[in-house]
Amino acid sequence: MKAVVILSGGMDSSITAYMAKKDGYEIIAVHFNYGQRTEQKELEAFRAIAGELNAKTYEIDLPFFEQIGASALIDTNIAIPKQGIEPGIPVTYVPFRNGIFLSVAAAIAEKEGADSIYIGVVEEDSSGYPDCREDFIQKMESAINAGTKPETDIKIKTPLIHLRKEDIVQLGLSLGVPLEKTWSCYESEDEACGECDSCRLRLKGFEKAGAKDKIPYKST
């Protein structure tokens, strides 16, 4: 059995990859370089986690995201919010990013004969991104299967979607995921800022799980 795992190198996607391995799949890890601020650090983390899993890898460049912009993750003229998580869709949302990622992953899955795509989206304890919602994932699965060969039957698996960050941290520790090799910060590549939404969620998760996050932080 083969599964394509969308692996950013972040904590959630890395734990998702280990879940796929636990489920008995041969892992095909796919990483996207799309002009994000922490592109090099994420790529380093991806390679480290994929190496731990002995996964076949694809590193896909999607430079057109920089032409689209419209997100603080890509456009350095838009500041990364550091006031805490607020209601609504934040400026760190990248327009339809997961839809595009899933489409590319589906093409790879069809080529490789994989029956599943794993993605580490989290609905309940996230920044409110619309492309992390379960309804969206279900509709993408239907669209993928409608637009591929008749014998293709791909399931999109989201093992973390209803978990809170502390549960995700505990799961990662129980699976032996080297969380110190993962990277979540939206802004920095040397030391995590400790203030962006992603850092705040990660730190809160470790704190509530009663565990220590071993990556370096500028501010905690």
Swiss-Prot record:
Zn(2+) binds at C185, C193, C196, C199. GO terms for biological process: queuosine biosynthetic process. Its EC number is 6.3.4.20. Pathway: Purine metabolism; 7-cyano-7-deazaguanine biosynthesis. It is an enzyme of class 6 (ligase). GO terms for molecular function: ATP binding; ligase activity, forming carbon-nitrogen bonds; zinc ion binding. The keyword Protein transport does not apply. ATP binds at L7, S8, G9, G10, M11, D12, S13, S14, I15, T16, A17. Keywords: ATP-binding, Ligase, Metal-binding, Nucleotide-binding, Queuosine biosynthesis, Zinc. Binds 1 zinc ion per subunit. InterPro entries: QueC, Rossmann-like_a/b/a_fold. Its cofactor is Zn(2+). It catalyses: 7-carboxy-7-deazaguanine + NH4(+) + ATP = 7-cyano-7-deazaguanine + ADP + phosphate + H2O + H(+). Coiled coil: none annotated. The keyword Metal-binding applies. Belongs to the QueC family. HAMAP family: QueC. NCBIfam families: 7-cyano-7-deazaguanine synthase QueC. Catalyzes the ATP-dependent conversion of 7-carboxy-7-deazaguanine (CDG) to 7-cyano-7-deazaguanine (preQ(0)). This is 7-cyano-7-deazaguanine synthase. It comes from Nitratiruptor sp. (strain SB155-2). The gene is queC.
